[in-house]
From Swiss-Prot:
The keyword Transmembrane helix applies. Disruption phenotype: Leads to elevated spore production. Residues 728-742 have a biased composition (Basic residues). One of its GO terms (biological process) is chitin biosynthetic process. It is a multi-pass membrane protein. Keywords: Cell membrane, Glycoprotein, Glycosyltransferase, Membrane, Transferase, Transmembrane, Transmembrane helix. GO terms for cellular component: cell septum; plasma membrane. This is Chitin synthase G. It comes from the Eukaryota. It comes from Aspergillus niger (strain ATCC MYA-4892 / CBS 513.88 / FGSC A1513). The chain crosses the membrane at residues 40-60, 73-93, 421-441, 451-471, 483-503.
Amino acid sequence: MAEELVPEVLVAWPTRDYIRRPITGVFEFSQSSWPFSSRCVGELVGIFLPVMIAILPLPPQITQYFPHQLVSVLQWFAFWAFSALLIIPWLFCVNRFVIHSLGRTKRVKEALDDRTAPKTVIVMPVYKEDPVVLIKAIDSVVNSDYPSYCIHVFLSYDGCNIDEPYLQVINHLGIPISLESYPQSIDVTYQGARITVSRFKHGGKRHCQKQTFRLIDKVYADYLKHHDDLFLLFIDSDCILDKLCLQNFMYDMELKPGSQHNMLAMTGIITSTTERNSLITVLQDMEYIHGQLVERTVESGCGAVTCLPGALTILRFSAFRKMARYYFADKAEQCEDLFDYGKCHLGEDRWLTHLFMIGAIERYQIQMCTSAFCKTEAVQTFCSLLKQRRRWFLGYITNEVCMLTDVRLWKRYPLLCLVRFMQNTIRTTALLFFILAISIITTSSKIKNLPVGFIAVSLGLNYILMVYFGIRLKRFKAWLYPLMFILNPFFNWLYIVYGIFTAGQRTWGGPRADAAKADEHTTPEEAVEKARVQGDELNVQVDTFRTKTEEKGVPIRPSSKVNGRLSFAPQLPDRYYDYQGALGTSLAKYLTPLPDVPRIGLHPHCSSDSVATSDSGGNSISLPQHVETLMSAEERAKLYIGSQAQESTGLLHTQEADGGERGLDVQSNEDLEDNRAYEMHTIESGSGIPSGKAPVLSSSVPQSGMQQSRAVPGNMSQPHEHLPQPKYTKRPSRIPRQKRRYMQPEQMV
C-alpha cells in the first residue's frame, strides 16, 4: 500500500510545478498567518499538519523523501479527523431538529393576554437609519402575535440631533412635530404598545445600549423587586420580526410546560432579505442559513451558543443587570492593543456571550430558539461586505482565543470547547479547495490524486441538511449550497487577509487616514475624546496606546467574580421570586469589589445589581416624559378627536373584512366599543377629553403613518403605573382565549 502512495519520481521538476509553487505558496502562507500570537500559529498548524500532508497534492520530488509508513499513518489520521468533525456535528443537527420544532410554527397552545404573558422590553438602537426601514421594523414588533400591553419598545437614537428622519419617525408614532422643544426621552402609546423614543449623545452602539439599559433599569426598578418575568430583546433597526417571534421566544424562555425558569439567554434565526438578488446576496442568504442552523445548532447541543448576535437576542433582564457592570465598563482608554479592542468593541456580542457562559451555573442555559425568526437587510456591495466581515472576523478571532484559553469554560463546556477547537484548526485550510484546483491545473498531478472522498463526504452531508432547510423554511435558495461550497473559501480567505492588514485601525467600517492617535502631545484619553468630537469614537489607532500609557492590567478573560454570578433566587408561584434571598447572595459579591474598581454605595431601593454600569461617573438619567404633557389643551383635544376618528375607521374596515370571512356584514356597537377599549388605553373616568393637535405628516412618510395613536398620561417612574386596565368583556384577542389563572394585582403593572 505504501508503495502505491508514491508515483514514479521525475528526474526534473516540470515547468508547471515551478509555476504552481509560487502561486499556491502565497495562499498557504497567508493561511498560516496569525496577527496575535505566533504560539497559536504553531499549535494550530502543528495539529493540522497531518491533514495538510495527506490532502495537498505535493510534487513527487518532495514526497519521495517522506517515510512511507509515516505517510500512511498520517493519511489515516486525517481521514478519521475529518470524518469525526463532519459526522458528529451532523448527527447533533439531526438530533436537535428531531427533538425541537424548526420553522415558523406556533408553539404556545394556551391563551396569552396581558396577565399571563411575560413583559418584554425591546431595545432598538438607531443610527442614521432610513425612516421607512425603521418604521417597518417598529411595526413588525408592535404587530407581533403577542399582547401589545406587554410590549415596551425603547427606540434609542445614537445622537442628539433633531433632523428630518427623526421627525418623520416620531410623527408616525403620534408625537407632534410642532413642539417647541423635545426632551431626551418621550413616551407614547402606539397601536396599544408603549414606545419610549430617546436621544443620547453619540458614542457607538454599545454606548447607546448602555444608556438605554440605565433608563430601563430606572423605569422598572420597583417592578423588578417582586418579579423576574421581565425580558430584554436586542434587535437592529433594520430587522423585521416574524409575527410569532416574541411568542416562541417566551415559550422556550418561560412558558414551556415543566420549565424551571432558568433560561438566561437565547438567539433566534436571522435570515437576509433584499429587493434585488445578486451573487453576493444569494451567498449571504445561504451563509446565514448554514451558519445558524448548522453551526449554532451544534453549539446549542453541546451546552451553549458562543455568539448572541445583537440583531436578535433575548435575555432575562435580572441576569443581564448582573453582568451590565462588566459589559458596559468604560475602558476605551485602556485598549493596550488591537486584541483588547477587537474583543470588547468589534466583538461586543461575543464578549457578552462569554460573560454569560462564565456566569451561568450549568449548561444549556444559553440556547438557540429554532422557531424565532427575523429578517435583516443583506449587504448589497462587495466593499460593504468586506468591511462587515472584517469586523466580524476580528471580533470572532479575539473572543475565540479568550474562550479556548479559559479553563473555566473547558470545565463547564468540555464538548463545546473541543468542537470549537477542532473547527478553528480547519480555518487553516479555508482555501484548500481553491489550492487543489490550482494544483490540478498547473502541475503534473492528476485528478485521481485528489482526496475525492473527503470532498464528497463534506459536500454531501451538508447538502442533505441544506435541502431539508430549504423545504422546511421554503427558502429554496439554500439548494444552491454547492455554489457556496466552491466560492466561500475564497471569500473567507479575503476576509482574513483584509482583517489582518487592517487590524491596527480602530474603526467600525475600515481604515481611515485621519484616525486619532496618542503621541507625545496627546494622551489616550484625549485621543478618544477627539474621535468622539469628530463623530466616531471607533476611529482611533489603538496600537499607539501601549507606548503612551502605563500598564493598567486589563484582563484578557473575565474576572473570577463573574464565575457563577447568574445564580437564581428561589422561584415562587406565578413568576414571583424571593428578591431578598437574591439580594443576600449579591451583597456579598458587592462587598468584595473587582481590582482597580472603586467601591460603590448600595442603591437606596436595594437594586444593587443595577449599579456600577459605568466606571466613568455620571450615573444619573432622566425619566421619559409623556407626549401629552408637552402639548397644549387645544392640541390634545385635536389629537384625541383625530385619533379616535382614524381608529374607528380602521376598526370598521377590519370588522368588515372579518365579517366577510365569517358571513357577517357588520359588528355590533357593543363589540366595537369593546374593541376600542382593547386597542387603546382608555382615559380615567372624570378626567375629561384631552385636547391636542394632530401633526401634519411629511410627504416622504408612508401612508400608514396617518394612523395616529393616543398617548396615555401617567407617572412613568412605574411601567404603566396609573394606567386603567382595558376591558375584558368580549375583548378580541390575537390568540383564542382560554381560562386564565388567577394572578396577584401587582403583576398587572
